[in-house]
Each structure stands twice: as C-alpha cells, then as structure tokens.
C-alpha cells in the first residue's frame, strides 16, 4: 500500500493489516524451515510485535520512511543438525529452494558464519546462516510497511499480545496475532 492509502486507514484497520502481514511472514518462515527440517527448532524470541522500520528493515526503505511512520516484522528460528559444520555445503538446501522459487539471492561470509539470503519479490526476505559449531538459523524479514503512527501500532499490538511463546516448536507453529477485540493489558 502507498503512504497515501495508509493515511486513510484507522488504527484498527492498520492493526488488522499488520496481522495479515504477520501471518504471511509466518507462512513463509514455516515453508522455508521445512526445506531444512520438519523437526524441532528453537525460538529466538517472540515474533508478533511490529518493529520500527525506516532503515532497519530489509530491502530499501521507501523515500520518507522513518521510525515513526513505518514498521517491519522479523522472525527467526535456530536448529542444530547432525553433521552440520558451517561449510558452504550446508547452504545448498536453502539455495536450491531459493533457486526453485526464482528468487534473487546471494551469499556472504559474516564473521565465522556463512549466509545465503533471498528477496522473495513481494516484500519479504529469507536468510539462512550456518555456523562452524553446527548451529544454523533461519530468518524471515519484511521490508518496511507504511503506518500512520509506529508507536500507536506497536502499543496496540503489545497491549493485546500475551507475549508468550514456546522455547521450541516444529515448523508452522507460531504465536497467533492478537485480535483487536482481545483484552487490553495495562
């Protein structure tokens, strides 16, 4: 949506739109996780709350985006796989997935980690990082989305989010995005 279209939305409308975007990111995360393992993944914090964007989101922030008028989502999971060593070969299953999807992707060495990342072409990025200790992580990150007031949207979400999440789960398990009608915590 354009900045002008978002300007016409109420906070409740933006909240519902953020929920749809959150669900899109969670579906992408689950699909990408399954390329590696249907087993148990460790959570790296909660996923529900939108984050102030501007230049913090993946991709290129739209002109005029600030931390006060844009937000993004990110979700990450960690897995330790038998035989994984942080070698380039550990990137191959995810790189194949990216190639099969036709997504623009690239790889890099980040400290001691190797990473491959892809732009889905519809506002999302997927990252897959492998480490020498055999631990690997997957991340899903949105590009910046417009909002009328980042703080108000974050507060509206946070006040309705019970902030509970599992320590670990299989792909497809996610925190439900709160409903506007959920009780507001103070």
Can you say where each PLM-predicted feature lies in the sequence?
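An acidic-aromatic pocket/loop used at catalytic or ligand-binding sites
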Residues: 1-36, 106-186
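Early exported N-terminus immediately downstream of N-terminal targeting peptides
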Residues: 15, 19-71
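N-terminal start-of-chain detector that recognizes signal peptides
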Residues: 14, 49-50, 88-89, 99, ...
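Amphipathic alpha-helical segments
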Residues: 28-35, 85-105
